[in-house]
Amino acid sequence: MADLTNLESKLGEVTGLAMAAKSATAKVMTLARKSDEEELIALLERMQTEAEETAERCTELAGGFEGKKTAILEEARETKDKGAQMLDIYLDDDSDALDGFEFLTMAEAGEVGHWEVLERLASTANAAEVKELVGWALPIQQRHFEEARKTSAKLAASEDPNDES
C-alpha cells in the first residue's frame, strides 16, 4: 500500500470521522426516539445526511490522489472503526438522548479539530481541492458541534439534578 503524506492521512481521518458520524447519529436517533423527541430526530436526520455527503465528497477527493485512494480509504476505515469502538463504550443499554448528545458533542469537537488541522495542512501545501473541501465542510462541522452542545445543555436543563442516575 502507498505511503501517505500528512495531508493525505488527515484526509483519510476526516473521511473516517464522517463515516463514523453517520453511525453515531443513527444510534443517537434511536435514543431520541425512545423519549419521543421529534425535534431532535429531525436535527439528527439532517446531521446524518450531511455526514453522508461529507464522506462522499471526501471519498471523491481521495480518488484524485494518484495511486493513493486505497491507502486513504484504509486510513478512513481505521478511523471509522475507532469511532465505532468509542461509541460502543460510551453509549450502553442505559443511555438516553442526553447521553447521546453528550457523545455527539465530544465527537463533533473532535471533527472540528481534525478539519482545522486539514485546513492548515492544505493551506501550507497550497492544495486547492482540499482547501475547497475544507471550506465547505468546516462550517458544517462547526454548526454540528454547536447544535450538539446546545442540545446537550437543553436536555440537561430538563433533568432533575437530584434524581438518581
Model region roles, listed by residue range:
Residues 1-165:
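Amphipathic alpha-helical hairpins
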